Amino acid sequence: ADILEIGVPFSDPVADGPVIQNASYQAIQKGTTLTKIFDMVEGVRKEKCEVPIVFMMYYNTVYHYGLDAFVARCIECGVDGLIIPDLPFEEQSELKTVLAKNEASPILIQLVSPVSKQRVPMLLENARGFVYCVSQMGVTGKGANFHKDIREYLAAVNRPVQFR
């Protein structure tokens, strides 16, 4: 695999469709916690897995854990990137400040959507690692109804971004 994305379950996954909502609910009911996920990642890294690991999660989970403690634990166990769909670019400064304190911090992955044409240059300029391209609007898991201008959108976004 080129990358491993781990979806961190959340108690109120409003941006997700029924499948991911149910998966989050089931995971939480069975005792999955962020601490256990960190421990799992640490175990994977001890097995010499070098595939980049990225967390897909809601910002509330990060905030509740504590920004400094969260970033420190990401570094400690080997999390390479963070995809946080409910954290818009304009509200990333607090987390970015904590991430900037250590070169080993995970990369904050920028999300670009088909309706953000004016924002694409700014988002790409601030992107590190890769860009997460949202291909359909609304909640996740609602079928394969891609945005009508998907080809043009992907062509506009498809350019090299700076790696850390």
Residue ranges: model-predicted function:
Residues 52-57, 131-138:
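Short beta-strands and strand-loop turn motifs
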Residues 1-8, 24-34:
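Active-site cofactor/substrate anionic-group-binding motifs, chiefly glycine-
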Residues 10-20, 32-44, 62-69, 84-103, ...:
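Active-site-adjacent beta->alpha loops and helix N-cap segments on the catalytic face
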Residues 18-27, 133:
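Short glycine/proline- and charge-enriched loop/turn segments
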Residues 5, 83, 131-132:
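Conserved beta-strand positions in the central sheet of alpha/beta enzyme cores
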Residues 48-58, 99-111, 158-164:
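Short beta-strand/loop segments at the ligand-binding rim of alpha/beta enzyme cores
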Residues 4-7, 74, 123, 157:
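Conserved, mostly hydrophobic/aromatic
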